[in-house]
Swiss-Prot record:
It holds the Pfam family PBS_linker_poly. This is Phycobilisome rod-core linker polypeptide CpcG. It is a peripheral membrane protein. Its main location: membrane. InterPro entries: PBS_linker_dom, PBS_linker_sf, Phycobilisome. It comes from Picosynechococcus sp. (strain ATCC 27264 / PCC 7002 / PR-6). The phycobilisome is a hemidiscoidal structure that is composed of two distinct substructures: a core complex and a number of rods radiating from the core. It comes from the Bacteria.
Amino acid sequence: MTIPLLQYAPSSQNTRVAGYTVGGDEQPFVFTTDNVISDSDFDVLINAAYRQIFFHAFKCDRQQLLESQLRNGQITVRDFIRGLLLSETFIDSFYNKNSNYRFVEQCIQRVLGRDPFSEQEKIAWSIVICTKGLAAFVDQLLNTDEYMENFGYDTVPYQRRRSLASREQGEIPFNIKSPRYDAYYRSQLGFPQVVWQNAVRRFRTPDRVPQAGDPALFLNMARSAQIPKVNVRVSAADISLAAVPYRN
């Protein structure tokens, strides 16, 4: 008997607050098949899906079968997103390199377009992965009312309400906020690394090397000179009050 999804309380986030937004460069562009009228539009939509799920997809990471089915109308955008989440690239890059809690966090960010409400939500979805498996977790996440109301079958997920008109600065994009590898796996790979480990040395051509009598040689000697510091203390009893200026 599988455990049902545990209940968790939502928190106040921008995605849950209805508001009037003004279109601009900071607002996310919605990619949907409703606006596709040519093959180039399909290319843009597919690349947007790769950026949302993989952040960056190499040529070897592309799912050509899923792309062909999407172009021919055999599957919806929602099915295409499901295929990317269950692909070998996503499993190897995210599922195998993170704990269940962190993997749930990254899936919620990429699929639902928001941050997890709390640790209770991470625990609830992690139990689904442990009891039902990865495929059941992806299906249950895509079948939520939240996903269907915001993206439906034909829209590529995006980070919702990242920028608000009342705030000078928007939220950090998910691909920057949540690195692909967990801290443990980054340490196993040796990150972060110091790229330059040698001392920086100054090179001078022979014609610019200081010769005897050059003032530059005396400059180093002057810098190395130790000048004693003398702290002069003045007692208030030695000050003549008649010398203090005053107003008439």
